[in-house]
C-alpha cells in the first residue's frame, strides 16, 4: 500500500524546487545506469520511478521483484540503480523524486538504439531484346532503430545514394531497410560496396562487397545455355517495379548517370520476361479477387432473399394458424354453451315429469272415487223408485 501511495506522488502536482530533463542513449542488450544525487543530507528520501509510473527503488528498498533492476549505490545524498539487458520496453522517461522539505524532481529520457544486421547484396541481370544488359543491385539490412543510412561505394571511391525503402514492423519502431541501384555498364573486375551507417555503430560502418567477376562468369555460362532467359540470383520480380538509381561502371572508372528515359525503358521493357510474368500474375490475382468478391456478394444476396421468403412464409403460416385457433375457440365456446343449455333443459324436464305424473294419479283417483260414489247413489235411488209403486198399488 505505501509503495502505491508513494508512486501516486508522481502524478500529483508537487512543489518542485527544480525540474531537469536529461537524455541517455543506450544500445539494445546493454546495461543502463541511472543516478540521482541531492545536496541535502538530513531527512531525505530518494525514489526512482519507471516510465510506467511504478516505483523501482525507494532508498535501498526494491519495489519491483525483477532481476533487471539492481541497486548500485545508496547513501543519504545518492541513489544509483542499473537496468540490465535493455530492450525497447525499457525506453521512456525515468523520474527521480527527492523527498525533503520540498519535493524535487529529476527526469531522464532513455532512448534505446537497435543496431542493424550485417547487410546482404543481391543481383539480378536484365537482358533486353536488343542485346543490352543491366544489373540491378539490392542491399538489404534488417532490424534497426532508427532507420540506417545506406550508400554505394563504386570502384574509385565514388560514394552515391540508391533508392531507399523502409519497412517498419508491427510495433512501428523496428525498421527493415533496403537500397536499390542499377549498373548499366560494368567491367569483369569491377567491385561495388554497400555501406551501412547507424548511430548505434558509433562511427563504424557495415560493409558488404559485391564483385561483378562472379556475375560475369555465371552470365557467360548461362549464355551458352540460353540467350533470352534473364538470370536472377535471389531478387524478386517485385523489386524491379521500384525506382532505382542508375550508374555505369567500367574496370578502372566509375561514372554516375541520371538517364531517366533509359532507366524507365529498362524497367518497363515488355521484353523482360520477369516483369511480364509479375504483371500477368498480379493481373490474374486481381481478376480472381474481383471474381471471388462478386461470387461472395451474389451468394450473400441469394441467402438474404431466401431468408426473407422464409420469414414471409412463416408469418403467413402464423396468421392462418391464429385464425384457425380463433375459429376453433369460438366453436368450442358455442359447443360448451349448447351443452350447458341442453343439460339445463333436461334437468328441468326431469324435475317436471314426476309432478305431472303425481297430478295424473291424483286426478285418476279423484275421478275413480267420484265415479264410484255416483254409481252408489244411483243404485240407492233405483231401489227406492221400485218400491214406491208397489205401495201405491
Curated annotation (Swiss-Prot):
Top-rank taxon, per record: Eukaryota
Biased amino acid composition, Polar residues: 247-256, 270-280
Amino acid composition bias (Low complexity), ranges on this chain: 229-246, 342-352
Disulfide bridges in this chain: 36-96, 139-194
Transmembrane regions listed in the UniProt entry: 290-310
Ig-like V-type domain segment(s): 17-111
A GO biological-process term: cell recognition
Position of sequence motif PDZ-binding: 390-393
UniProt key word Lipid metabolism: no
Stretches for region Disordered: 218-280, 333-356
The keyword Membrane is annotated on this UniProt entry: yes
Endpoints of the signal sequence: 1-16
PROSITE patterns xref list: IG_LIKE (PS50835)
Phenotype reported upon loss of the gene: No visible phenotype. In the small intestine mucosa and under steady-state conditions, severe reduction in the number of intraepithelial CD4+ CD8+ T-cells and, partial reduction in the number of lamina propria and intraepithelial CD8+ and CD4+ T-cells. In intestinal CD4+ T-cells, expression of gut-retention molecules Itgae/CD103 and Cd69, and gut-homing molecule Ccr9 is reduced. Development of lymphocytes and myeloid cells is normal. However, in older mice, the number of CD4+ and CD8+ T-cells is increased in lymph nodes and blood.
Domain Ig-like C2-type stretches: 119-208
GO MF annotation, one: signaling receptor binding
Biased composition range(s): Basic and acidic residues: 257-267
SMART domains per UniProt: IG (SM00409)
Topology feature Cytoplasmic, residues: 311-393
Tissues/organs with expression: In the immune system, expression is restricted to activated class-I MHC-restricted cells, including NKT, NK and CD8+ T-cells (at protein level). Transiently expressed in activated CD8+ T-cells and a subset of activated CD4+ T-cells (at protein level). Expressed in activated intestinal T-cells, specifically intraepithelial CD4+ CD8+ T-cells, intraepithelial CD4+ T-cells and, CD8+ T-cells in the intestine epithelium, lamina propria, Peyer's Patches and mesenteric lymph nodes. Also expressed in spleen, brain and testis.
One Gene Ontology cellular component: plasma membrane
Entry function: Mediates heterophilic cell-cell adhesion which regulates the activation, differentiation and tissue retention of various T-cell subsets. Interaction with CADM1 promotes natural killer (NK) cell cytotoxicity and IFNG/interferon-gamma secretion by CD8+ T-cells in vitro as well as NK cell-mediated rejection of tumors expressing CADM1 in vivo. Regulates CD8+ T-cell proliferation in response to T-cell receptor (TCR) activation. Appears to be dispensable for CD8+ T-cell-mediated cytotoxicity.
PANTHER family noted in UniProt: CYTOTOXIC AND REGULATORY T-CELL MOLECULE
Domain notes: The extracellular domain is required for the regulation of IFNG and IL22 production, but is dispensable for late T-cell polarization.
Oligomeric and partner information: Monomer. May form homodimer (via Ig-like V-type domain). Interacts (via Ig-like V-type domain) with CADM1 (via Ig-like V-type domain); the interaction competes with CRTAM homodimerization and CADM1 homodimerization. Interacts (via PDZ-binding motif) with SCRIB (via PDZ domain 3); the interaction promotes CRTAM and SCRIB polarization in a subset of CD4+ T-cells.
The protein, known as: Cytotoxic and regulatory T-cell molecule
Gene that produces this protein: Crtam
Amino acid at each position: 500500500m505505501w509503495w502505491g501511495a508513494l508512486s501516486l506522488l508522481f502524478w500529483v502536482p508537487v512543489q518542485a524546487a527544480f525540474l531537469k530533463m536529461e537524455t541517455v542513449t543506450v544500445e539494445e542488450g546493454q546495461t543502463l545506469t541511472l543516478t540521482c544525487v541531492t545536496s541535502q543530507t538530513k531527512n531525505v528520501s530518494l525514489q526512482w520511478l519507471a516510465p510506467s509510473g511504478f516505483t523501482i527503488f525507494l532508498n535501498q528498498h526494491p519495489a519491483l521483484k525483477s532481476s533487471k533492476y539492481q541497486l548500485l549505490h545508496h547513501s543519504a545524498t545518492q541513489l544509483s540503480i542499473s537496468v540490465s539487458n535493455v530492450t525497447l520496453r525499457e525506453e521512456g522517461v525515468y523520474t527521480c523524486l527527492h523527498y525533503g522539505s520540498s519535493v524535487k524532481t529529476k527526469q531522464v529520457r532513455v532512448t534505446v538504439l537497435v543496431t542493424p544486421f550485417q547487410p546482404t547484396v543481391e543481383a539480378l541481370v536484365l537482358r533486353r531484346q536488343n542485346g543490352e544488359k543491366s544489373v540491378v543491385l539490392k542491399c538489404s539490412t534488417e532490424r534497426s532503430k532508427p532507420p540506417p543510412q545506406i550508400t554505394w561505394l563504386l570502384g574509385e571511391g565514388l560514394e552515391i545514394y540508391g533508392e531507399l525503402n523502409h519497412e517498419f514492423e508491427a510495433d512501428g519502431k523496428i525498421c527493415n531497410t533496403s537500397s536499390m541501384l542499377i549498373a548499366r555498364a560494368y567491367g569483369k573486375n569491377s567491385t561495388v560496396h554497400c555501406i551501412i551507417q547507424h548511430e548505434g555503430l558509433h562511427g563504424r560502418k557495415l560493409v558488404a562487397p559485391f564483385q561483378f567477376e562472379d556475375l560475369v562468369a555465371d552470365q557467360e555460362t548461362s549464355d551458352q545455355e540460353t540467350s533470352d532467359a534473364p538470370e536472377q540470383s535471389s531478387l524478386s520480380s517485385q523489386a524491379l517495379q521500384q525506382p532505382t538509381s542508375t550508374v555505369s561502371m567500367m574496370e578502372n572508372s566509375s561514372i554516375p548517370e541520371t538517364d531517366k528515359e533509359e532507366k524507365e525503358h529498362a524497367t518497363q521493357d515488355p521484353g523482360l520476361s520477369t516483369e511480364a510474368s509479375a504483371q500477368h500474375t498480379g493481373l490474374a490475382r486481381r481478376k480472381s479477387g474481383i471474381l471471388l468478391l462478386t461470387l461472395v456478394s451474389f451468394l450473400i444476396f441469394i441467402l438474404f432473399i431466401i431468408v426473407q421468403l422464409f420469414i414471409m412464409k412463416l408469418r403467413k403460416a402464423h396468421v392462418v394458424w391464429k385464425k384457425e385457433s380463433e375459429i376453433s375457440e369460438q366453436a368450442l365456446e358455442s359447443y360448451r354453451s349448447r351443452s350447458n343449455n341442453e343439460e339445463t333443459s333436461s334437468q328441468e324436464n326431469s324435475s317436471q315429469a314426476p309432478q305431472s305424473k303425481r297430478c295424473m294419479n291424483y286426478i285418476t283417483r279423484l275421478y275413480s272415487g267420484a265415479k264410484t260414489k255416483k254409481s252408489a247413489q244411483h243404485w240407492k235411488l233405483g231401489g227406492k223408485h221400485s218400491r214406491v209403486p208397489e205401495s201405491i198399488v
